[in-house]
């Protein structure tokens, strides 16, 4: 079966080699040091985050809308997290985007790069859950996940970072309580072949591994490395349009 990826517009390194020795993402020193750096950046950003959010909102050139998360730069985050992908909502006016509870708004710059996402709250006085994207280069970026109260203040909930590391890429984040999580992507010929994930709240549990199964140039399933107790495949996610249980 061929291994490729769907045309989802998400950035992958060009033709990397397969990693020779998988990282122990629970205990890897580099990942631990990155957690420390991210936490320090979270703390240092607390006094400037409100101005940063309002500055980014002022840079938005266009908005798109959906019923759930849809424009997520990190590869397959919805699928890996078991979350539904949003459906595009049309005929939404910008002035009404925060009045429709549960509506997701995605803000883009003039070049079409996503700068932020917001979920319209039930009560705007309780704040708007907002993601602010800050790019280091064409591939790596930080995400500030915040609660934004317009014209008042902003609270940082967590900070995440997507970056390349040797032949792999990593998406990891940490919150104000130092709880952290990490996704490590392995590639084959420039395309995702496997993802390892771990969250600190899992304690002694082993990191999870997921294999990406493709057919006819389309991702058809994300399958757990280990089988279920009954011997069945652990199908974490499947593309209902193309998935064939017998393949």
State each model region's role:
Residues 2-247:
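Buried hydrophobic residues that stabilize the cores of well-folded domains
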């Amino acid at each position: 079966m061929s291994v490729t990826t769907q045309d989802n517009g998400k950035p992958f390194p060009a033709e990397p080699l397969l990693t020779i020795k998988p990282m122990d993402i629970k205990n890897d020193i580099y990942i631990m040091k990155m957690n420390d750096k991210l936490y320090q950046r979270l703390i240092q950003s607390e006094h400037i985050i409100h101005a940063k959010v309002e500055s980014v909102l002022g840079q938005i050139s266009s908005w798109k809308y959906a019923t759930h998360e849809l424009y997520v730069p990190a590869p397959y985050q919805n699928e890996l997290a078991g979350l539904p992908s949003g459906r595009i909502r049309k005929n939404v006016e910008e002035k009404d985007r925060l009045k429709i509870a549960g509506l997701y708004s995605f803000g883009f710059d003039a070049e079409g790069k996503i700068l932020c996402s917001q979920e319209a709250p039930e009560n705007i006085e309780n704040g708007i859950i907002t993601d602010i994207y800050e790019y280091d280069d064409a591939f790596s970026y930080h995400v500030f996940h915040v609660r934004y109260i317009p014209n008042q203040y902003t609270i940082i909930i967590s900070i995440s970072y997507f970056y390349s590391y040797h032949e792999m890429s990593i998406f990891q984040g940490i919150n104000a309580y130092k709880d952290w999580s990490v996704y490590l992507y392995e590639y084959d010929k420039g395309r995702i072949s496997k993802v390892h994930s771990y969250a600190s709240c899992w304690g002694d549990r082993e990191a999870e591994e997921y294999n990406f199964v493709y057919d006819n140039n389309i991702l058809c399933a994300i399958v757990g490395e280990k089988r279920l107790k009954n011997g069945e495949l652990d199908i974490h996610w499947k593309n209902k349009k193309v998935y064939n249980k017998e393949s």
